[in-house]
């Protein structure tokens, strides 16, 4: 099984207070799609990931497959599974292409 892992050269952190504020706004029905909750530092550049992107990034720990990540997120977010799966796949494909994620080497 192909598990996803973050590029170890990328320094990152979860902005906990900001994440909680974004979650509160989400519960209130506000649009939070542009709100960054995870900060990545790469080649002197700072990048922000929104709530869903940050959750995906955090779950790419080398232990989980794409399907396992979708399963976890489907329990957290009130979204149709097929739509969520397509969004996660698109996001992961983008990060794979950028070299920010890769597939963990199989230990089998």
Predicted regions and their residues:
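Acidic, low-complexity/disordered tracts enriched in E/D and polar residues
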Residues: 1-54, 58, 104
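Long, charge-rich, low-complexity alpha-helical segments
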Residues: 34, 42-108
């Amino acid at each position: 099984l192909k598990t996803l892992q973050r590029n170890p050269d990328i320094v990152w952190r979860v902005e906990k207070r900001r994440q909680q504020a974004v979650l509160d706004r989400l519960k209130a029905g506000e649009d939070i799609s542009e709100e960054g909750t995870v900060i990545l530092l790469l080649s002197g550049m700072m990048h922000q990931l929104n709530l869903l992107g940050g959750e995906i990034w955090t779950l790419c720990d080398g232990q989980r497959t794409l399907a396992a990540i979708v399963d976890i997120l489907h329990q957290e977010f009130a979204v149709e599974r097929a739509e969520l799966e397509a969004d996660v796949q698109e996001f992961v494909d983008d990060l794979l292409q950028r070299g920010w994620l890769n597939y963990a080497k199989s230990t089998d």
